[in-house]
């Protein structure tokens, strides 16, 4: 895991702008001892936020926990965060609805915090 890099080894950020949203990529570890976004990691398919949740990966519980964690982490309403890919995979893509430029700034600030 890259504790502070804003980009993976490919030189890309773990998010991109969409239509009135940002699409962010996460590598999820369920059944963890805590709920946390811990940094940026290179997954081989590109960079992703390394994320842990306490929820188990059954009946969508870990996916729901990830959506709630990301909403809280970014300070956005829960309804603005939705899983769009990776329902049964560790690699997830979330759509975060809102002003893409503002969300980009929030995500970059969070990545910068990993460097401290």
Label each PLM-derived region with a short phrase.
Residues 71:
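The alpha-helix within a helix-turn-helix
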Residues 1-59, 63-68, 78, 82-88, ...:
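Contiguous, often N-terminal, cationic amphipathic patches that form binding interfaces
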